[in-house]
From Swiss-Prot:
GO terms for molecular function: DNA binding; DNA-directed RNA polymerase activity; magnesium ion binding; zinc ion binding. It comes from Cucumis sativus (Cucumber). This is DNA-directed RNA polymerase subunit beta'. SUPFAM superfamilies: beta and beta-prime subunits of DNA dependent RNA-polymerase. HAMAP family: RNApol_bact_RpoC1.
């Protein structure tokens, strides 16, 4: 549908029988109206042509071949010179065959049928509006009992039957005579209603505004009563109040959307376009049909049987008619939602038929598979892995994916730079993956962002833009800081990559969708680019050194025991003197040369003008040297003093991991300060 703002949208809801017939009906030049499917047949077994008025009828749903009618006549589509748009012999319209994807038909039901979604699904909307138990309504719909509708204040059939034992003795003689009168069946049908027709009558008699008013008054009365002191009664009152709120909201929705409650009971059953329930011929001449066709055939068979009982056989017992109405109701239920009433219907191979609900719901349903999650051009999908060396706004794209996504741009680049004379030569170079191809591909990718999406896309940060770079392997590399926005981790998650084609899409990606432009949560405003997953583990490993300071494992070798009753593994344990480094570059160089480990403690020279925060005043040890200098050793730092007790230098106890982390933080702060200075 198109709303008043010209936005395309899809709305699922109830429609009137008039709207259903308007969707399907077509008027032929001879005045005949077609659109109703009356026969349960599909194709003729000899001619392989659709049966007239059947489930694939060309008069109702349009021609199988564009511009060719059932007779074989051909006319140019859209030719204004042609007077008639319909074939005079077969009544098929000369239009494009794609009309069979959206042209609907309908089945005129011989009896009203409740829509099983609004009756059996929880909460039951019909039971909510009528304020009646669901079991009672189900018994009424499936003809287990009847609904009384007395037409006068005088004693009627139902009143007489209900008060038979309480009236005077003379009624015992008059009632049997009354039951055997000639017009009793007509009188009974006038007073007794059963099946979905009874539900439709009750829904049609509803005044939605009165429902809202009465429900509101009752809700206020229950609220004024207060707690009764009985837990069971208080829960019962609470459930009733919740029910009244739901009933008022439902009634307001019907009023706001101009939907009549009786539309929940079907008189016309829409028939899907044929292309949405196809019959396909496979190898060997066998036909493979959609389950929807078989369920439609079952509805038509039972509906036609009911029509015959009502029209041709005047003396049909009422119980037989009620039984056939129940069969029609069950057939429509199976078509709409197979298995909702218990055991699902199965075919001859014990396979459950896929109903309309099964076709549209779930991950493989019509909406999620072919509309929301359909495959599009210029897109790919792969597993994500961590890219620790990437910038926040970059992503690593595998060569195999990149060369396919940017193939069109790559061909244009090869031709423009005269590396290929035409498209064929360019494609040949791409297939052979010549070195020049990768150079041109890198140039193309530098100015073209890509969009990464992880399903389900629950908020706008589920799709973000990145600057792609080529990486080896077959996995997409992602910066770990952007994982929280995607709700992704690196345990096998997959992400889709899309290439924005138009200039508007590329500009929007660069200005609004780049990952470094989306650092805050759009819901609560908190930072969303925070360390998670692998980054937390990496930070822990980087900074996990010996946290107990110089005292650890130095004076108490028994600390190396795993248990008090176990022996020391290394009885020759000796304290290893930590190395001294003048600057962080020497320490990192020693780590790269594998002279020290990432978490090995070391002494790093500290600047005298920088303050060291001490946790204790007295030194743990004091080492004196022959020249008179001495070293005062504290928990996490060391001070070298002269004979005159002047501070010569300070060393702090740290690890290569801490040094690497602090250098990264320092570079980030300096870069931020430079950016701010450029901005001012």
């Amino acid at each position: 549908m198109i709303d008043r703002y010209k936005h395309q949208q899809l709305r699922i809801g109830l429609v009137s029988p008039q709207q259903i017939s308007a969707w399907a009906n077509k008027t032929l030049p001879n005045g005949e109206i077609v659109g109703e499917v009356t026969k349960p047949y599909t194709f003729h077994y000899k001619t392989n042509k659709p049966e007239k008025d059947g489930l694939f009828c060309e008069r109702i749903f349009g021609p199988i071949k564009s511009g060719i009618c059932a007779c074989g006549n051909y006319r140019v589509i859209g030719d204004k010179k042609e007077d008639s748009k319909f074939c005079e012999q077969c009544g098929v319209e000369f239009v494009d065959s794609r009309i069979r994807r959206y042209q609907m038909g309908y089945i005129k039901l011989a009896c009203p049928v409740t829509h099983v979604w609004y009756l059996k699904r929880l909460p039951s909307y019909i039971a909510n509006l009528l304020d009646k138990p669901l079991k009672e309504l189900e018994g009424l719909v499936y003809c287990d009992f009847s609904f009384a509708r007395p037409i006068a204040k005088k004693p009627t059939f139902l009143r007489l039957r209900g008060s038979f034992e309480y009236e005077i003795q003379s009624w015992k003689y008059s009632i049997p005579l009354f039951f055997t009168t000639q017009g009793f069946d007509t009188f009974r049908n006038r007073e007794i209603s059963t099946g979905a027709g009874a539900i439709r009558e009750q829904l049609a008699d509803l005044d939605l505004r009165l429902i809202i008013d009465y429900s509101l008054v009752e809700w206020k009365e229950l609220g004024e009563e207060g707690p009764a002191g009985n837990e069971w009664e208080d829960r019962k009152v609470g459930r009733r109040k919740d029910f009244l709120v739901r009933r008022m909201e439902l009634a307001k929705h019907f009023i706001r959307t101009n939907i009549e409650p009786e539309w929940m009971v079907l008189c016309l059953l829409p028939v899907l376009p044929p292309e949405l329930r196809p019959i396909i011929q496979i190898d060997g001449g066998k036909l493979m049909s959609s389950d929807i066709n078989e369920l439609y055939r079952r509805v038509i068979y039972r509906n036609n049987t009911l029509i015959d009982l009502l029209t041709t056989s005047r003396s049909t017992p009422g119980e037989l008619v009620m039984c056939q109405e129940k069969l029609v109701q069950e057939a429509v239920d199976t078509l709409l939602d197979n298995g909702i009433r218990g055991q699902p219907m199965r075919d001859g191979h014990n396979k459950v038929y896929k109903s309309f609900s099964d076709v549209i719901e779930g991950k493989e349903g019509r909406f999620r598979e072919t509309l929301l999650g359909k495959r599009v051009d210029y897109s790919g999908r792969s597993v994500i892995v961590v890219g620790p060396s990437l910038s926040l706004h970059r992503c690593g794209l595998p060569r195999e994916i990149a060369i396919e996504l940017f193939q069109t741009f790559l061909i244009r680049g090869l031709i423009r730079q005269h590396f290929a004379s035409n498209i064929g030569v360019a494609k040949s170079k791409i297939r052979e993956k010549e070195p020049i191809v990768w150079e041109i591909l890198q140039e193309v990718m530098q100015g073209h962002p890509v969009l990464l999406n992880r399903a389900p896309t629950l908020h706008r940060l589920g799709i973000q833009a990145f600057q792609p770079i080529l990486v080896e392997g077959r996995a997409i590399c992602l910066h770990p800081l952007v994982c929280k926005g995607f709700n992704a981790d690196f345990d096998g998650d997959q992400m889709a990559v899309h290439v924005p084609l138009s200039l508007e899409a590329q500009a929007e990606a660069r200005l609004l969708m780049f990952s470094h432009m989306n650092l805050l949560s759009s819901a609560i405003g908190d930072p969303i680019s925070v360390p998670t997953q692998d980054m937390l583990i990496g930070l822990y490993v980087l900074t996990s050194g010996n946290r107990r300071g110089i005292c650890a494992n130095r004076y108490n070798p028994s600390n190396r025991k795993n248990h008090k009753n176990e022996k020391i593994y290394n009885n020759n344990y000796k304290y290893t003197k930590e190395p001294f480094f003048c600057n962080s570059y020497d320490a990192i160089g020693a780590y790269r040369q594998k002279r020290i480990n990432l978490d090995s403690p070391l002494w790093l020279r500290w600047r005298l003008d920088q303050r060291v925060i001490a946790s204790r005043e007295a030194p743990i040890e004091v080492h004196y040297e022959s020249l008179g200098t001495h070293h005062e050793i504290y928990g996490y730092y060391l001070i070298v003093k002269s004979i005159k007790k002047e501070i010569l230098c300070i060393y702090i106890r740290t690890t290569v991991g801490h040094i690497s982390l602090y250098r990264e933080i320092e570079e980030a702060i300096q870069g931020f300060c430079r950016a701010c200075s450029y901005g001012t």
